């Protein structure tokens, strides 16, 4: 029997998750909830500037959509607690609105009858933060609300874990060179949150910004909690980002080849490895949560310490979405 999924919030991540789930056996989206009208949602599902056209058939019908012959109910309910998740026997809600980002708020989906909630954002408070294939084995099935972290944390975590496990990570700094997103202005204008830099034209500027990924990594890999800090530079590309991580290692005399070899050995469906001289457009649509770029590894001895700089690519849309769907499937499987 298929795992029944509802998507709350049919924006960039919600729609791409819908697409991704179509290719995953055993998962079925049965409902979406978004305040936008169905005709617009169907259009944006079918056509996507960065990820390309959806290959399936999409039709608006009364009360929802028909996608590849399957009916999907659509709601425009602003209060998650009033959604009919119990009547629809929803196994997992993929929470993509950005509003239900702590356990107390996400509990509204549980109260409405859903069995589990996966938040597509960093969560506040006592919520397990999962990066699939880094710490998903910490889930035991008892959790009702789980966070899928952020796209940047998903790119950072496997790299940081390898450095910590193999060479000892003392401390470090990360920078994400990040595509612009919907929380930036396309023309110079007052920003809704009063941010003077995000008020500037996203496609024309390199815009310094903050990131919580360095702090959040401690929720994923407790042994490096507090050892990293970081920032972001938003750049004029619509998707396709890069995380640079520079750390002091505990182990001495580490070489570039040793670092790259350790990363290659750790590669899996979530963590890719490449020695090709790629650029950001090459990784758009990629389903690795993080793609280690061996061509950018550098090492330096500073006093009696070893300094290493590494880099990993990620599609801040599809890479993250693929990781979310992996976590969603695992979370639901544990509940069977």
UniProtKB/Swiss-Prot annotation:
GO biological process assignments: glucose metabolic process; glycolytic process
Name of the protein: Glyceraldehyde-3-phosphate dehydrogenase 1
GO molecular function list? glyceraldehyde-3-phosphate dehydrogenase (NAD+) (phosphorylating) activity; NAD binding; NADP binding
Q: What is its EC number?
A: 1.2.1.12
Which reaction(s) does the protein catalyse, per the Swiss-Prot or TrEMBL entry?
Answer: D-glyceraldehyde 3-phosphate + phosphate + NAD(+) = (2R)-3-phospho-glyceroyl phosphate + NADH + H(+)
One GO CC annotation: cytoplasm
Q: Which gene encodes it?
A: gapA1
Record-linked SUPFAM superfamilies: Glyceraldehyde-3-phosphate dehydrogenase-like, C-terminal domain (SSF55347), NAD(P)-binding Rossmann-fold domains (SSF51735)
Q: Which SMART domains match?
A: Gp_dh_N
Q: Where is this site: Activates thiol group during catalysis?
A: 178
Please give the pathway this protein is involved in. Answer: Carbohydrate degradation; glycolysis; pyruvate from D-glyceraldehyde 3-phosphate: step 1/5
Residues annotated as catalytic: 151
Complexes and interactors: Homotetramer.
Which positions are annotated as binding NAD(+)?
A: 12-13, 34, 120, 316
The organism of origin for this protein:
Staphylococcus epidermidis (strain ATCC 35984 / DSM 28319 / BCRC 17069 / CCUG 31568 / BM 3577 / RP62A)
The residues forming the signal peptide are none
CDD domains the record matches:
GAPDH_I_C, GAPDH_I_N
Establish whether keyword Transmembrane helix is in the entry.
Answer: no
UniProt family annotation: Belongs to the glyceraldehyde-3-phosphate dehydrogenase family.
Q: Among its keywords, does the record have Cytoplasm?
A: yes
Keywords from UniProt, A to Z, are: Cytoplasm, Glycolysis, NAD, Nucleotide-binding, Oxidoreductase
């Amino acid at each position: 029997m298929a795992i029944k999924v509802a998507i709350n919030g049919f924006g960039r991540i919600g729609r791409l998750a819908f697409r991704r789930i179509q290719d995953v056996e055993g998962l079925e989206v049965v409902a979406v909830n978004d305040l936008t009208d169905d005709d617009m949602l169907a259009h944006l599902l079918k056509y996507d500037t960065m990820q390309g056209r959806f290959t399936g058939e999409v039709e608006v019908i009364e009360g929802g959509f028909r996608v590849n012959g399957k009916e999907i109910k659509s709601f425009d309910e602003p209060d998650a607690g009033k959604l009919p998740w119990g009547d629809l026997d929803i196994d997992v809600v993929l929470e993509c609105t950005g509003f239900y980002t702590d356990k107390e708020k996400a509990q509204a989906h549980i109260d409405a009858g859903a069995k589990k909630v996966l938040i597509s954002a960093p969560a506040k408070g006592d919520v397990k933060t999962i990066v699939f294939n880094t710490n998903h084995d910490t889930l035991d099935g008892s959790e009702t609300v789980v966070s899928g972290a952020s796209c940047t944390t998903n790119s950072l975590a496997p790299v940081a874990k390898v450095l910590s496990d193999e060479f000892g990570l003392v401390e470090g700094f990360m920078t994400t060179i990040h595509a612009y997103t919907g929380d930036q202005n396309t023309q110079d204008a007052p920003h809704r949150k009063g941010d003077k830099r995000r008020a500037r034209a996203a496609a024309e500027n390199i815009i310094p910004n903050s990131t919580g990924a360095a702090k959040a990594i401690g929720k994923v890999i407790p042994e490096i909690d507090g050892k990293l800090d970081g920032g972001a530079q938003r750049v004029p590309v619509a998707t396709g980002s890069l995380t640079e991580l520079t750390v002091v290692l505990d182990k001495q005399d580490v070489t570039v080849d040793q670092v790259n070899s350790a990363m290659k050995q750790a590669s899996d469906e979530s963590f890719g490895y490449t020695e090709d001289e790629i650029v950001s457009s090459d990784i758009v649509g990629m389903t690795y949560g993080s793609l280690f770029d061996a061509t950018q590894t550098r090492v330096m001895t500073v006093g009696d310490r070893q300094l290493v700089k590494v880099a990993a690519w990620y599609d801040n849309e599809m890479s993250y979405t693929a990781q979310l769907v992996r976590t969603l499937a695992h979370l639901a499987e544990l509940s069977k």
